[in-house]
Swiss-Prot record:
Protein name: Pre-mRNA-splicing factor cwc25
SMART domains: Cir_N
Coiled coil stretches, renumbered: 15-59
Coarse class of the protein's main subcellular location: nucleus
Protein encoded by which gene: cwc25
Stretch list, region Disordered: 154-415
GO cellular component labels: U2-type spliceosomal complex
Family (UniProt): Belongs to the CWC25 family.
Organism of provenance: Emericella nidulans (strain FGSC A4 / ATCC 38163 / CBS 112.46 / NRRL 194 / M139) (Aspergillus nidulans)
UniProt keyword Coiled coil present: yes
Biased composition (Basic residues): 194-208
Assembly mode: Associated with the spliceosome.
Keyword Nucleotide-binding assigned: no
Highest taxon, organism lineage: Eukaryota
């Protein structure tokens, strides 16, 4: 069900990474063996060539000299400034044509012609020409080294130039980003300054805690008056709806009664009913007008009171802003101290109550445990007395009493 747990081991040969590692090692070993075999074959070939050359020399052939000093022979050692010229040639600062085309230098180069590779095979000496000399000079390992050094130096210079250009481009980009950020912060600062000035104009400069408290109290009173007016208006509207509904019902009943009376016989009190209805309508309209006038007067009086209160609070705040700051601070500190003391007293009282409750609970639990312990001891003592009585009775019984008690059982067995 859980599979082979050996597959979870890093050394298990069935894992793909282990198989890949083994395959890579085998491939590397095979390539190494191939290279070793190639080197062995090359050495065998060189050994065979050397053996053939040795046999040729022993048969009377010319002895071949393994020399490479011709590569480092100086073309012109007579002049004292040859080292500077050769260094300039190797660094690519001077041309080699003027040095190689001189007759005397060509003759000096031809001194080692008899010891060249052609002399070993018994061939006539090879005359060195300009092309061979140029080929030998271009095959100079020191020249190749200097060329590589020069190429590395040029690549390093180009890389430093490219790095400097990238740094300059990065600095220009950072400068543009910095200017854009400064411009954005400046615009946002102007916007915040304008909004701050607008808020500063819309509110007062500085208000004392007393003025803020009066304003808050004034707003609460205004809210209470507004809610009271709304409740009065709703009550009046509800009364009007009830009155109109009752009036409609009364009119409907009256019309039904009048129609019934007309159908039966006209009565002389019809005018009195109409006059009474008109009087009721006039009384209702007069009452409603008086209520609306009282509500308008109360709202105008409240508005005047609110305006007067706001002016008085503003004047009081402007006159007592500097004088009442210290008094308000002292009063606030005193209130905080009193509140802290009151809370401390409440906490102490609560702690005392909790301690008394805890002691009472501990006493009750202790009494209950003591009572249970006494009951257990009593029960245990009664049981011990009963068992001790049984043991004592068994010890005091004689053989005759035991036989007498068991006689009935023996009689039953005999039957």
């Amino acid at each position: 069900m859980g599979g082979d747990l050996n597959l979870k081991k890093s050394w298990h040969p069935s894992l793909l990474r282990n198989q890949e590692r083994v395959w890579a090692e085998e491939k590397r070993a095979l390539e190494e063996r191939k290279r070793i075999d190639q080197l062995k074959r090359e050495r065998d070939e060189e050994r065979q060539i050397q053996e053939l050359q040795r046999l040729q020399e022993s048969a009377g052939g010319t002895r071949q000299l393994q020399r490479v000093d011709w590569m480092y022979q100086e073309p012109s050692s007579a002049s004292g400034h040859y080292a500077e010229e050769m260094e300039g040639y190797l660094l690519g600062k001077r041309r080699i044509d003027g040095i190689l085309l001189k007759n005397d230098e060509s003759k000096k180069l031809e001194k080692g012609a008899a010891t060249g590779p052609g002399a070993a095979a018994g061939l006539p000496p090879v005359v060195h020409n300009t092309r061979d000399t140029m080929a030998k000079v271009m095959a100079d390992p020191l020249l190749e080294i200097r060329k590589r050094e020069q190429a590395a130096y040029e690549a390093m210079v180009k890389e430093s130039v490219r790095r400097r250009e990238r740094e300059q481009g990065r600095e220009r980009h950072q400068e543009r980003e910095r200017e854009r950020g400064h411009r954005h912060r400046r615009d946002s600062g102007n916007d915040s300054h304008r909004s701050h000035r607008h808020r500063r104009r819309s509110r007062s400069r500085s208000r004392s805690p007393r003025v803020e408290k009066d304003d808050r109290r004034h707003r609460d009173r205004e809210h209470d008056r507004r809610s009271h007016r709304d409740r009065d208006g709703e009550r009046e509207n509800r009364v009007e709806r009830v009155y109109h509904s009752s009036r409609r019902d009364h009119d409907r009943d009256e019309r039904y009664d009048r129609a019934a009376r007309r159908s039966a016989s006209p009565r002389p009190d019809r005018r009195r009913d109409d006059r009474r209805d008109r009087d009721q309508d006039q009384d209702y309209r007069r009452d409603r007008n008086s209520r609306s006038s009282r509500r308008d007067a109360r709202s105008s009086r409240d508005r005047d009171t609110d305006a007067f209160g706001r002016d008085r609070n503003r004047d009081r705040g402007s006159h007592s802003r500097n004088g009442n700051a210290d008094a308000n601070a002292d009063q606030h500190a005193q209130e905080l101290e009193e509140q802290r003391k009151r809370r401390l007293a409440e906490m102490q009282a609560n702690a005392q109550d909790m301690e008394a409750t805890r002691r009472q609970r501990v006493a009750e639990v202790t009494a209950l445990e003591e009572k249970q312990r006494e009951e257990d001891d009593k029960r245990r003592s009664d049981r011990g007395q009963f068992m001790s009585g049984l043991h004592r009775q068994l010890q005091e019984d004689s053989l005759d009493e035991r036989i007498r008690r068991s006689r009935g059982a023996l009689t039953k067995d005999e039957d």
